[in-house]
Amino acid sequence: VLSPADKSNVKAAWGKVGGHAGDYGAEALERMFLSFPTTKTYFPHFDLSHGSAQVKGHGKKVADALTNAVALVDDMPNALSALSDLHAHKLRVDPVNFKLLSHCLLVTLAAHHPADFTPAVHASLDKFLASVSTVLTSKYR
């Protein structure tokens, strides 16, 4: 459960992402594909090379979903319901992959905003991304 301090940290950190959200989403996906090659199996139709338009497009979708989750942090189950259905029933993404992408997002954010990535912010973002992952996997049961 996110505390009021966690929610404040997440909103402040995501606010600093600003117009770079799509770029950071794409960078996190590239990082995930390089670090965890098995995740590529969900994207057989994508050009997974550095800077590909498909990875950038999906990175923007990821970032937009996270922006929505930040904005509706107190109602994430409703905010992410359609994505949960999509990933559970149509795409059938293994839930562990959400943890892998979350880790890559944290690394990406830390690389771009090292001064802002304090231990407290890191912990809050980690809890937030874990909450997002929990919501996205809730319809698997």
Swiss-Prot record:
Keyword set, alphabetical order: Acetylation, Heme, Iron, Metal-binding, Oxygen transport, Phosphoprotein, Transport
Phosphothreonine, modified sites: T108, T134, T137
PANTHER family, alphabetized: HEMOGLOBIN FAMILY MEMBER, HEMOGLOBIN SUBUNIT ALPHA
Disulfide-bonded cysteines: none
Free-text function comment from the UniProt entry: Involved in oxygen transport from the lung to the various peripheral tissues.
Modified residues (Phosphotyrosine): Y24
GO biological process: hydrogen peroxide catabolic process
Pfam families in the record: Globin
Name the UniProt record assigns to this protein: Hemoglobin subunit alpha
Protein source organism: Saguinus mystax (Moustached tamarin)
GO CC annotation, single: haptoglobin-hemoglobin complex
N6-succinyllysine: residues bearing it: K7, K11, K16, K40
Residues where O2 binds: H58
